[in-house]
Amino acid sequence: MGINREEQFLCNALAEVLAGKEPPHPEKGTDMDRVLELAYAHKVHPLLYECSDWEEVSAEWRERLKRESRKIVSQNYRLLFLTKYLTSVLEENGIGTAVLKGVGVAQLYPVPELRKSGDIDLLVSRKHLAKAEELMKEAGFAREEEQWTRHHVSYVIKE
């Protein structure tokens, strides 16, 4: 079973965008609404922002791409600020961290701000975990009541 025209176009467009190039225009008969539905389902739609002005893109999707991209950029700046804040608080207290996924992976994108992310993943050594948790509480974060896994601890910011 092969991939259809829309899936092939999405893969080609993403490859070009991630290489820092303009995405190709679709072949005649390519259903751009379907392409954008796929991109949205895989959370890579912000990478197709440049396509939003193409005539092949419906007005509904054009507006949605622009709106979603602006929202993602805003969320990412907030996450970037919080990441820098948390890592500096921890490092000032002798706790080294490694940033996983999110901000770190975004640097691989041609436009890092368009990498969709919803949280901050920090790796802290087990021996520093108790102190890190204390510092996060002092910084305005609260431990989530329900922890879904054993390999990490989830916090939310108190707002």
Predicted features and spans:
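Generic secretory/membrane-interface signal
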Residues: 1, 113-115, 146
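Helical scaffold of the NTase/Pol beta-like nucleotidyltransferase catalytic core
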Residues: 2-101
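Residue-level detector of solvent-exposed, low-hydrophobicity positions
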Residues: 16, 51, 68, 116-119, ...
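Charge-rich, low-complexity amphipathic helices
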Residues: 57, 61, 112-113, 158
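Short, glycine/charge-rich beta-strand/loop segments that flank catalytic centers
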Residues: 70, 100-111, 147-155
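Conserved catalytic core of two-metal-ion nucleotidyltransferases
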Residues: 75, 79, 83, 137-159
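Active-site nucleotide-donor binding segment shared across nucleotidyl transfer reactions
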Residues: 82-134
